[in-house]
Amino acid sequence: MNSAVTSPFASTTVTTTSTSSSNSTTRSNTNSLVIHGLPPVSPSFQLPFKLTDVDLLRRDCHVHGEWVSSRSNKRFAVLDPGTGRVWATCPDSTRDDVHSVIKSSFSAFQVFSRTTPARERARLLISWHHLIIASRMDLATILVHETGKPLNEALAEVDYGAGLVRWFAGEAEHLDPDPPLPSPAPSPTTSRASSPTSEDSAASALPTPGTGAFLRKRGAILKRPIGVVLALVPWSFPLALTLRKSAAALAAGCTVIVKPSSETPISALALACLADRAGFPAGVLNVLTTSLGNTPVVSEALCMHPLVKAVSFTGSARVGKRVAASCTRNLKRLSLDLGGNCPFIVFDDADLEQTAKDLAALKWRHAGQACVAPNRCYVDRRVYESFSNLLIAEAAKLKLGHGMTRGTTLGPLTTIRGLYKAEALCKDAMDKGAVKLLGTGRREPGDGYFMAPTVLSGMTDGMLMCREEIFAPILGLYVFDTEDEVVSRANDTPVGLAGYVFTKNHDRLWRMFERLEAAVLGMLGDGYTNPSWKQWQWIHASAIHGPRRISDNKGSRDATIVNDM
């Protein structure tokens, strides 16, 4: 999953400058939008949509229950990927803004963790869930204009995220039971057949069962909220991942700082607005926005601050390594969900027609910009041609367009950077012998960051598309002959988040389940995550811990309790 925590690409930034000249707008060579004059704290652009709840549209940072700008008063632009036009701006926070946000979260934690029992936290989460559902269409509309995804996909993301909040609300009620008091452990044996050694003498000095000293001691474990949790959220599924990270931490009694991607800050701010209405105390959920250019500095400052006790990051493996390096300096608790270059394996006995439909749905969801989207489609040579034809027929049904246009099933890429990378990957494959079966592999003419669904055949393992996370509506088809061969090739990747297998042979399914090195496996279907999963495992550089993160936000304390008898 790509993320904007660090990037070599320039961002689009709105800079406020004081001048007596007219309020003209200029664009520099670095793609920086400069607004001359002193605009209001939240500069207003003509919105391309209308919300039922206009108060839900927030454009400032959310700190301790207040809507504030950055200290520099600079702002960055939020673009609609479907048009390439600016429709909002947000504060471009810097390192100077970090301490005040963390101070707010820490002071709120001191009260929230001690005075809000589990049942009250569950009630707050349920209230938040109801408000999210009530604002379902407004939130989805914001998502469409942030990410570019079609409206039906945005609505599905809202529903999924709301379901996570409701699930964690249920889990919250089970978090504060009285700690169990274990039975006294047997003492070391004091009798020895031979003469006592120095170790025997030390053991004989320990209390034995039945003595007063032994009966007065009990072991206990007290689980407490770990503290301030930082959520670094990508632009691919900004609402769902903000809710997944935040709801788990809030259920545990922690406070949360959300640092959304520079492409998708408005949805996180809308969720903070609803959290206020739900009754969460000030400072429990803070949102700090910043531009792409300032993201590395701000993220590092947040990760390295001593009052931040846990960090949850979703994004690329490259950036995840940098986040991990920043966190390990202070030994913070860390949760990483990283990239995937997912294989999709079609054996000759699979239901080819249904498999082609499933592949099209999985691959072109959000224009291929999902960490679990299939990138490498391995097809048994005996059914390669027939399956290719079925897949092309399914892909040809997709309707490319703006996410708010009725009937759209494939939206634009979220960023121009992603579009340029997709073009480069496609060109590399074709230069090395790949053949286009569908699409152009290039940007569509007109406004927005559109690319038609593209299918390439004749793919080889030496092409960049086989090695890198694509995050675009491009799919490569690879031929294989044996099960051992396809397992070896599928596992030959540094990022193995997900994988898919389609066959009617149940023995083969179990073998693939055991042999494929992927954290999430879809057998004859999708491998979507759900909140009840306890943990993902280490799979290459893809996943460390999973959606069920409540235990990640709790700390354990060991104690020896002496009863005053």
Give short role names for the model-derived ranges.
Residues T83-A88, V308, I345, K399, ...:
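Conserved C-terminal structural/oligomerization subdomain of aldehyde/semialdehyde dehydrogenase
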Residues R85-D176, P182-P186:
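Glycine-rich loop-to-alpha-helix module at the N-terminal edge of alpha/beta enzyme cores
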Residues V86-S93, Q110-R114, L230-A231, F344-F347, ...:
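Short, well-ordered beta-strand elements within core beta-sheets of diverse protein domains
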Residues P177-Q354, F480:
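Rossmann-like NAD(P) dinucleotide-binding subdomain of oxidoreductase/dehydrogenase enzymes
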Residues T255-I257, K436, V520:
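A short hydrophobic/small-residue beta-strand
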Residues N2-S32, S183-T208:
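Low-complexity, intrinsically disordered regulatory regions enriched for serine/threonine
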Residues R318-T460:
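ALDH superfamily catalytic-core signature
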Residues N2, S7-P8, N29-T83:
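Hydrophobic face of amphipathic alpha-helices that form TPR/SEL1-like repeat modules
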